[in-house]
From Swiss-Prot:
Record carries keyword Lipoprotein: yes
Pfam families (UniProt xref): CD225
Protein name (Swiss-Prot/TrEMBL): Interferon-induced transmembrane protein 10
Species in which this protein is naturally found: Homo sapiens
Extracellular side: 1-154, 222-228
């Protein structure tokens, strides 16, 4: 038999317009100088049977969005397709042999259902996640300082007003003591402290001046002016 010479391999490439498909395959001619007919023309039948076509090598396809109503909030659905997040590709089936069963420690039912739900559920909308993470409005309780420690000098003011009311200083001290009580009821700690200091000052002044007058009176009574 005469063996024919094998010519150079012919490369047939095409570019599809649907879904931006780009593919290229190689076909080897059966006889010398023969190439397969272009796409759409009938192939030559005089050269014998041709080899089977090699499947597309290097072709890639853009997955179409799944049919059905889109899931998510209105803000996510209303976005144009270009701005929406691409769907995660489905995992390819692996041809590896089945693995031996592995034993794991027992888990609670709630944690198991949560892990299965997190692994199999599609990614939730970020707007829904933000709504779920929003906390309820908290009630603010104002804690006022303890005003019972503020001394109003009320008894001291009454004593000075009744017995040692020198130049009405005891009356003024009593008025400030009453103001301290009112501000303690209103939870005004700063005002109560200031009025308490003022009442104390007037009580000290009234007591000192009244005591000085009493001492002078006793001195003049013990040593009258006629002795000098």
């Amino acid at each position: 038999m005469r063996e024919g010479k094998r010519g150079p391999p012919c490369i047939l490439s095409f570019r599809g317009t649907l879904e931006r498909v780009e593919a290229q395959w190689e076909l080897e001619a059966q006889g010398p100088g023969q190439c397969p007919a272009p796409l759409g023309d009938p192939a030559s039948t005089t050269d014998g049977a041709q080899e089977a076509r090699v499947p597309l090598d290097g072709a890639f396809w853009i997955p179409r969005p799944p049919a059905g109503s889109p899931k998510g909030c209105f803000a996510c659905v209303s976005k144009p397709p270009a701005l929406q997040a691409p769907a995660a590709p489905a995992p390819e089936p692996s041809a590896s042999p089945p693995m031996a069963p592995t034993l794991f420690p027992m888990e609670s039912k709630s944690s198991k259902t949560d892990s299965v739900r997190a692994a199999g559920a599609p990614p939730a909308c970020k707007h829904l996640a933000e709504k779920k993470t929003m906390t309820n409005p908290t009630t603010v309780i104002e804690v006022y300082p303890d005003t019972t420690e503020v001394n109003d000098y009320y008894l001291w003011s009454i004593f000075n007003f009744v017995y040692l009311n020198f130049c009405c200083l005891g009356f003024i001290a009593l008025a400030y003591s009453l103001k301290v009580r009112d501000k303690k009821l209103l939870n005004d700690l700063n005002g109560a402290v200031e009025d308490a200091k003022t009442a104390r000052l007037f009580n000290i002044t009234s007591s000192a001046l009244a005591a000085s007058c009493i001492i002078l009176v006793f001195i003049f009574l013990r040593y009258p002016l006629t002795d000098y």
